[in-house]
Amino acid sequence: MEVIADRLDDIVKQNIADEKFVDFVIHGLEHQCPAILRPLIRLFIDILLFVIVIYIFTVRLVSRNYQILLVLVALVITLTIFLLLYTIIVLD
């Protein structure tokens, strides 16, 4: 259990260091641009980081759970077809 706690502490420290580095890079990029564009650059970088995190999360989710996701997709398709046929029969 102590090994896991030590590993989690190392991960937290690495995340803090990574965040400081990213903030340093963003700060450098902001000061190369005119003052009027700085908020737009900051917004663009934040959106880019958000998209990267969502992409990584989605790839991990799909790669680890593709079987259950396929079952859920098949279930949704089956229920959709059933509801369409049911509404066609009821409306006639």
Swiss-Prot record:
It is a multi-pass membrane protein. It comes from the Viruses. The chain crosses the membrane at residues 39-59, 67-87. The keyword Transmembrane applies. Keywords: Early protein, Host cytoplasm, Host endoplasmic reticulum, Host membrane, Membrane, Transmembrane, Transmembrane helix, Virion. InterPro entries: Prot_L2 (IPR008447). Pfam families: Chordopox_L2. GO terms for cellular component: host cell endoplasmic reticulum membrane; membrane; virion membrane. It is found in: Virion membrane; Host cytoplasm; Host endoplasmic reticulum membrane. The keyword Iron-sulfur does not apply. Early protein involved in virion morphogenesis. Participates in the formation and elongation of crescent-shaped membrane precursors of immature virions in cytoplasmic factories. Belongs to the orthopoxvirus OPG096 family. Interacts with OPG158. This is Protein OPG096. The gene is OPG096.
